[in-house]
Amino acid sequence: LSETGKILYEDLKGKISGIAENGGSTEFTFTASEYPYSTEADLVKEVKAVLQALLSDCPYEFYWYDKTVGMQYGWYSTNSLASINLTVAGAYRASGTENTYKVDSAKATAAANVKAKANAIVATYKGQSAYARLKGYKDEICKLVSYNDAAAKPGYTGGYGDPWQLIYVFDGDDTTNVVCEGYAKAFQYLCDLDGGLTCYI
């Protein structure tokens, strides 16, 4: 990332973390004085790089994001104002068709409860070797969830959402399961909480 991109990364990371915890709008605006992009093409290129970095670094915080739809960009040359709108998955969208870019606060609160379960798993293996911790995290995930064969089939009509996220892994409900992406995000999240392991999925 460029120096400006790094600043944008930290700004968006803070906002996205807040949305994950409390819900709210996923429409962001900023001015050229904050992030000096000269053209819309420059903005789009940098935002794509920033978003990819955030998706890799923040598996929990993006549980609400529908990456199959993605984001929308806006660039208003008259006042050098730019906008980034991130699409919310249907399961976490605030009621009303106008809320494509708003996370329901109650659903965000419910999602935040899974953090306690994840932290408890990390605490269980604290002080053990790196190998023991990695194996322990893998085993715990496999005990908590099964592969969601239905969601993996071409004819699945449920849309992109929780089967691809880590929420279903730690929600304590054995009827909610995930596909490969959900397993991977859950494993990375435990490694991130561990603090002593570096994991890139």
What are these regions (language model features)?
Residues 1-9, 13, 87-111, 137, ...:
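Intrinsically disordered, low-complexity repeat and linker tracts
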Residues 23-36, 89-102, 113-124:
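Acidic/histidine-rich, surface-exposed loop or edge segments in extracytoplasmic proteins
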Residues 7, 11, 42, 46-49, ...:
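Extracytoplasmic/secreted proteins, especially bacterial periplasmic and envelope-associated proteins
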